[in-house]
Amino acid sequence: MSRPDRAINSEAGDWGYSEDAGERAWLLQSPSVDSVQPPSQSDDSRGGTSSLGAVFIVVNAALGAGLLNFPAAFNMAGGITAGVTLQMCMMAFIITGLVILAYCSQVSNESTYQEVVRAVCGKALGVICELAIAVYTFGTCIAFLIIIGDQLDKLIGAINNESEKEISLHWYTDRKFTITLTSVLIILPLSIPKEIGFQKYASTLSVIGTWYVTIIVIVKYIWPSKDVSPGIIPVRPASWTDVFNAMPTICFGFQCHVSSVPVFNSMKKPEIRPWWGVVTISMIICLFVYTGTGVCGFLSFGSSVSQDVLMSYPSDDVAVAIARAFIIICVVTSYPILHFCGRAVLEGLWLRFKGEEVETDVAKERRRRILQTLVWFCLTLILALFIPDIGRVISLIGGLAACFIFVFPGLCLIQAKLSEHDVRSNSWNAMVAYGVIMVTIGAFIFGQTTTNAIYKDIINNPNSP
């Protein structure tokens, strides 16, 4: 509900519901969020999601491809203790960030993440936020294509009942071929349409696939295969700075903040108190899933664990092959949805630059949409063909995820409190201080992870001096 007694921006245009195409991207990671109807100004037509339904949607929005990288993140952090401790320390900020966004959504009467940032923090930060969302979705699309290349050759080997050495002899199991063929024949046709109508199916597959992978990793740790032997299992980080290596994966895994704003507004009672319960339960569920996968996957393979944990299992394992099939289906159906969100944001920025609200020329919109899709698709495909594993991508976009979790919510909280005309009490000072802490932590994570990722790419490049 709008709070007219609290001024956020003096510009009247920042308060109304935006019709920008870029601000109609109701979903970032999870297909299910897009199925939530945008809220109307009438209370009677404001969504009807129950608290239990909201928990399901938030969990679905958080769980995703980052799950496969958690065992490797625990290894990079220096062991289970360091990885779990880091997760627990970040959990408080992750949950409060979700609550802050809901509070600012109420104050500004806006219904999507980028709209809230734009209304509360101003147009400049709104544009930066939209660009960050576009880059984030672009990077996630690259990660999806890499996962296809990682899993499809081993899935083919399982179907043909062939060993690892035999798989590599076939031209049709070459990683670049499988990524290109799958992308051109399936993903590209699904990405071109203006609207996406298969979200609910992708949502169901995503949930089933994620939980199945977690169960398989845990079961395979309890009853390991004879062909699997773990490497060295570190019990502590070699250096205290190694702990920060897990931050991109944790941020990428728990980032559901962009999707959370429309979920909050879709609830039967979009109020802060029930929302606290929703996000707390959701993040606890995610914590158990990620920790279970990370701990069991790490203990199964130790320091030899792959960036994609499923790559560490033998290709002839039927149960793991089913997990690979689930993951491939999930990413194939999720790529078009992520692309839709990124394309919608870019379209909104373009229309705003032109000073228009909507594109009235249907033919012009169609040509631009096809061009945007082809450029996006070709760039993500080319990069996926030459990036060796998802760890490289997550290490970069994990820093952006930290901005969505820490920086933008912190800035929104600071600006919202500074705009209040009430007496500035101790609680007011504490809230502003907390916002400053969130921005500082987020900026540190973004800077540290991005710099570290670039540095590692440089030193691992054989052509570097």
Curated annotation (Swiss-Prot):
The chain crosses the membrane at residues 54-74, 82-102, 128-148, 177-197, 204-224, 244-264, 275-295, 318-338, 370-390, 394-414, 427-447. It catalyses: L-asparagine(in) + Na(+)(in) = L-asparagine(out) + Na(+)(out); L-glutamine(in) + Na(+)(in) = L-glutamine(out) + Na(+)(out). It is found in: Lysosome membrane; Cell projection, Axon. GO terms for biological process: amino acid transmembrane transport; asparagine transport; glutamine transport. The keyword Transport applies. The keyword Ion transport applies. GO terms for molecular function: L-asparagine transmembrane transporter activity; L-asparagine:sodium symporter activity; L-glutamine transmembrane transporter activity; L-glutamine:sodium symporter activity. It is a multi-pass membrane protein. Its main location: membrane. InterPro entries: AA_transpt_TM. GO terms for cellular component: axon; lysosomal membrane; membrane. Keywords: Amino-acid transport, Cell projection, Ion transport, Lysosome, Membrane, Sodium, Sodium transport, Transmembrane, Transmembrane helix, Transport. Symporter that selectively cotransports sodium ions and amino acids, such as L-glutamine and L-asparagine from the lysosome into the cytoplasm and may participates in mTORC1 activation. The transport activity requires an acidic lysosomal lumen. Belongs to the amino acid/polyamine transporter 2 family. This is Sodium-coupled neutral amino acid transporter 7.
